[in-house]
Amino acid sequence: MPITEDTGLDRLLDAETIAVVGCSTTPGKAAHDVPAYLQRQGYRVLPVNPFADEILGEVASDTLVDVAESVDLVNVFRPSEEVPEVLDAVRKRHADRGDAGAAWLQLGITHDEAATEAEADGIEIVQDRCLKVEHSRLRG
């Protein structure tokens, strides 16, 4: 089951490095402003966007597999129909590297089947919640 209780959400906020799949270069978009907020809170934000070279002062990777650094949490800003592909990449990374043990799907983003498959492989999942809102609520 995806994490919904405050204790589990707060535990995921102990992450240090967050890969943001679908990170945007455009201020004013949630996919830019949420990662910028997280960066201001002290998280290392690693943007994943094949159409950008740099976002928020960090080199942007084309795919999650291309992120060289260890990843604690994957924050997803992609449409729900793309979630299976994104979570497959999280599962592969977790199996190959032992990191990326959790994925946080932003507000409005869900895919129960893909989430269940990822959980079966040991990935913790949050769906349909804003990481910025939950961080502010639990740690602000």
Please provide the spans of the model-predicted regions.
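Short N-terminal or domain-adjacent regulatory/targeting segments
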Residues: M1-A15
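Conserved SAM-binding strand-loop segment of SAM-dependent methyltransferases
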Residues: E58-T63
